Amino acid sequence: MSDHVRPSWGGDPSIAWRILLSSVPRQLLSAETVAEHQRVLHETQGWPAPPPVVTGEAAAVLREVAEVRDVPLVLGVSGAQLVVSAFHAYVDGLGLLEILAALTGQPVTSSARGVGDRRADGGGAVDRLREVALAPPASVALPTIIAAEGDAFAALSVEGRVLTTDLVHAAVAAIVDRNTSRGRPSDHVAIAVGAGRPATPGERLANRSELIRLRDLELLSLSEIETALRAAPLDTAGGSGAAGGRLARYAQKALASRLGSTLLVSHLGEVTTTAASVPTFYPVTAGGTGLSLGAVGHDGTTVLTLRGRAAQWDGSSLGALLTQVAERLT
C-alpha cells in the first residue's frame, strides 16, 4: 500500500516541470525489465503505481515523456537508450542519477558537491520585482520556425571536463553574439545556476535543488564570473517552482517571462559509473526565456544540451545555439 503524499508545488502550470536523463545502459534492458525495476522503485519510494514504459523512436519518446503531468516518474525505452523523466516536485538532478542506479543495479555517483551552507538572499522577492520594473533580464533573439507543442531538444558532446564557470561564460558569450548579429540588445544577462544538496544515505528521493542567480554577466570576465558564482547567495524569489517561493504565489502568470532569467544552467558534475554511457541531462524550461542548458561529464566527455519551448525553438535552431556555446569553450 502506498504512503504517497504529493509534494507541494507552486511552479508555472503551463509547463510539465519534468527533468530528463537519457543514457545507454551497458546491459540492454527490455521495456519489461525496466517496468519491473520501476515498480520496485515506486514501492520503495511510496509512490503510486507507475505508468507504462513509453517505447518508440528516440526523439518521439523524449518528447512524450517530457510532457507527462504530475506523475513522479515516467520511463522511456528506444532501442538501447533509456530515458528517465521525473516530475521536479519529487526529484532533483542528482536524484536522476539515483534512479539510474536503481534501474541498472549499479552505483552512479557525481562529483557535484552541492551548495553547502551558502546563505540565502533575504531580499529576493523585493529585489526581483524591482528588477522587473527597472532592468528586466536580457532575452535571446528567437529564430523563425514553425511552432509546435511541447519542448524541443538539442545535444552535443565535447571532449574533456567542463566546469560550471566555463559553461556560464561560454553561454553568455554565445547569447551576446547571437543578439548582436540580429540587432538585439544584451543588457542584463541573467543566468540561474541550478545546484543541489546531496542526499544522505537512506534518504528518499526528493527535490533538494537550489538556484544561484547572477546578473549583468555580459560585463564580467571568466574570472569575475567564477568569483561571483562562489560568492552569490541562494536565490529565494521562487524560481525553483517550490510552493514556498513568494513570487510564485502572486506574480508568476503575469510576469513569468520577466521574472525569470536569460538562461538556466545546470551541471550534474562528473559522473562515475559502469552502469551506462552517454548520460545526457535536460533541465526544466521554466521562467524567463524558457531556455535551459544542461551538462554532465562521463569518461572524459561532457554532453551539453539545450532545451526550449517548441513554440519558439526547434531542434535545428537549438543545435545552432548550442554549437555556438561549445565553440566558446575552446
Spans of model-derived segments:
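Non-catalytic N-terminal regions of enzymes
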Residues: M1-G124, A155, R161-R213, A276-T330
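Internal metal/ion-chelating core segments
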Residues: G114-R161
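Helical lid/core segments from catalytic subdomains that handle acyl or acyl-like groups
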Residues: R204-V271
